[in-house]
Design a protein with these regions (language model features):
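Short catalytic/metal-binding and nucleic-acid-binding patches
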Residues: 1-178
């Protein structure tokens, strides 16, 4: 079966979901989940996209991202999945399939849509009985480990990539909170 074509718009914000290979609970291991989380934010710090929300569940991830003007959503997801696969293989000393091919996306339309998807991301571990409160789950945006980017329409920020004239003033945020 052919993978669906993604039709992404430069500067738009997306809710993205991707699953592990055969829905295996790879990210139940905190060290592996940390590798993925660090990969997401190192790609962000390199100016590839903005990260507004994320959650790393045992067998899938949800993110709200705004790709850079010269980075497609497909490329952003490829950077995260490909880089994390290599880093996980190195840490484990062996290669094994991490990711299911492809991903699903939903373009965020307005503030209400952004708020409802943010709430869904933050509450995902509570619904799965992995935490009692969103901020108790260590591999998600509600935990507060990483500085998040404001949603561009709400903040006036531009999509990243310094090659784009509108984003020249955008500076990468430090990944970890002081």
């Amino acid at each position: 079966m052919a993978r669906p074509e993604h039709r992404t718009r430069p500067g738009a914000t997306y809710f993205v979901t991707t699953n592990t290979w055969q829905r295996r609970p790879v990210f139940q291991n905190p060290e592996i989940a940390t590798i993925l989380e660090q990969r997401i934010f190192s790609c962000r710090d390199a100016g590839n996209f903005l990260v507004h929300r994320h959650i790393i569940m045992p067998d899938h991830i949800h993110m709200i991202l705004t790709p850079g003007m010269s980075t497609s959503l497909e490329k952003a997801v490829q950077l995260i999945k490909g880089g994390s696969s290599r880093q996980i293989a190195k840490a484990c000393g062996t290669r094994f399939p991490i990711w299911h091919q492809g991903f699903t996306e939903h373009q965020i339309r307005d503030q209400h849509d952004y708020d409802s998807h943010s709430k869904y991301v933050d509450e995902n571990p509570v619904k799965a009985h992995l935490a009692e409160l969103p901020h108790e789950f260590p591999h998600g945006s509600a935990f507060g480990k990483f500085v998040l980017d404001p949603w561009p329409p709400a903040s006036g920020a531009e999509a990243p990539n310094s090659s784009h004239p509108l984003s020249a003033g955008l500076k990468p945020r430090p990944s970890a909170r002081p």
